[in-house]
Amino acid sequence: MTRKQTPMTLALCALGLFAASAASALAADAPMAPPKSEINAAVGTGAQFTPPPESAIPDDDFGKMVKLGRDIMLDTPKYAKDFVGNTLSCVNCHTDAGRMAGSAPLWAAYVSYPAYRGKNKKVNTFEERLQGCFKFSQNGKAPPLGSKTLVALESYSYWLSKGLPVDEKVAGRGYPNLPEPQQAPDYVRGQKVYEAKCILCHAANGEGQYVNGETVFPPLWGPKSFNWGAGMGSYKNAAKFIYANMPYGMSYSLSPQEAWDVAYFMDAHERPQDPRWQGSVAATRAKFHDSKFSLYGTKVNGKLLGDIGAPKPR
């Protein structure tokens, strides 16, 4: 039995299954992805860091926990099913199993906590940060502190960060800064970018693509995607991620304006309710989404986003 493959492998396989000729045409027209050294240089000015290869995972009890953490990253609905409420996996936002610079890599996150977070206005441990990912990005519920799921993810993150000094400035942490758009992000322009660059993998209605019930390309909106409380619910965060990582394997092929526009388009669609629901869209926006980068509680194409009632119990 083989474990779930990496996103790149899945992407190549799925493109062959779904649209081989279209994929070939797209690849022929697309600019080549920059080499990894250039990608790293583009996402920070600190020291370069390369996490250890999978072959270096120790063959002992600790190594087993590291491998479980890796597997949770790659197929979260399978290996952490009790805490997941959608079809996303951690690797959808932390590419290359949490290794990729400029894609919020786990090795950079691990050495950055404990840290104060404005999102919940308190100092968070690394485990608490992971809990938030399950609650918002996975639209599920937080695994208990000390649970096997969190211990496995923490072990994997620790192992990836071996050799990286704590709190040292390092290239590739988080998502790269993105220049402010020359024009205000726009739904219509974003839709054009989506149809030209994203629809092949993520489908016409953002529902993603599946093979034998398994997610191959993640849903970007709708009931199976992240909820309104997730970091990607800020189109500024989404734009930074998209610019550095999408289309998959073609980092930095979009212009900054295109990244802003398509992020706006993505976030201008409905998705599961913010679990911090305050009883009304207006109250929830006032407390948690009072930002020009959140479309929650605003009207887009005549639809009040977030007006879907209370969140479903988890």
What are these regions (language model features)?
Residues 88, 92, 148, 152-155, ...:
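Amphipathic alpha-helical interaction segments
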Residues 273-314:
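A cross-kingdom marker for long, charged
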Residues 189, 196, 200-201, 206-208, ...:
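C-terminal cap of thioredoxin/glutaredoxin-like
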Residues 2-70, 76, 115-188, 297-314:
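Post-cleavage N-terminal segment of exported redox proteins
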Residues 78-85, 141-146, 166-170, 250-257, ...:
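Surface-exposed patches in mature extracellular/periplasmic domains of secreted proteins
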Residues 63-68, 72, 100-143, 153, ...:
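Extracytoplasmic electron-transfer domains, predominantly the class I c-type cytochrome c fold
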Residues 91-100, 158, 201-208, 221, ...:
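Detector for the c-type heme attachment site
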Residues 61-97, 181-217, 235:
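Sequence/structural segment immediately N-terminal to covalent heme-attachment motifs in c-type
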